């Protein structure tokens, strides 16, 4: 079971497929995810069951949470404004667990914020025991958004 990473009712958000678009900050690289633009502080929800593997600062992603699900897919939630204070590394989460809030953190040293509009950067990575690679989350987000809206009528 999966759900959309933001509430589908009561909050405005927008997103489109930007997988592979170039990124300039911190050197040339490609966009490994989907940006979901929303108001500052909009709740960010776990899309799946999994274990909190990482919480903290990353110079690119700012305040971020990483969750590994039972299919060994790593779900990356970045640019957060804050974390759920009850959450810690090693915790088991389920779809809908609040991880934090949408923000604009990142692109600099710890605490840097406001270099871009508030949004959730959502990424998905697969690991086969040797290498990890990113794949486009956009088709999954479209499906999960539709399912979440149907379930929450």
Residue ranges and their predicted role:
Residues 66, 91-152:
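Conserved, short, structured surface segments that act as functional micro-motifs
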């Amino acid at each position: 079971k999966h759900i959309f990473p933001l509430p589908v009712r009561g909050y405005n958000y927008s997103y489109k497929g930007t997988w592979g678009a170039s990124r300039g900050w911190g050197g040339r690289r490609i966009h490994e995810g989907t940006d979901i633009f929303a108001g500052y502080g909009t709740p960010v929800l776990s899309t799946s069951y999994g274990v909190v593997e990482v919480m903290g600062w990353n110079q690119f992603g700012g305040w971020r949470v990483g969750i590994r699900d039972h299919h060994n897919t790593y779900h990356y939630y970045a640019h957060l404004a804050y974390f759920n204070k009850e959450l810690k590394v090693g915790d088991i989460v389920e779809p809908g667990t609040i991880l934090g809030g949408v923000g604009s953190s990142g692109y600099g040293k710890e605490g840097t914020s406001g270099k871009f509009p508030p949004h959730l950067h959502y990424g998905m990575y697969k690991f086969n025991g040797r290498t990890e690679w990113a794949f486009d989350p956009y088709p999954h987000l479209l499906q999960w958004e539709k399912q979440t809206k149907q379930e929450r009528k």
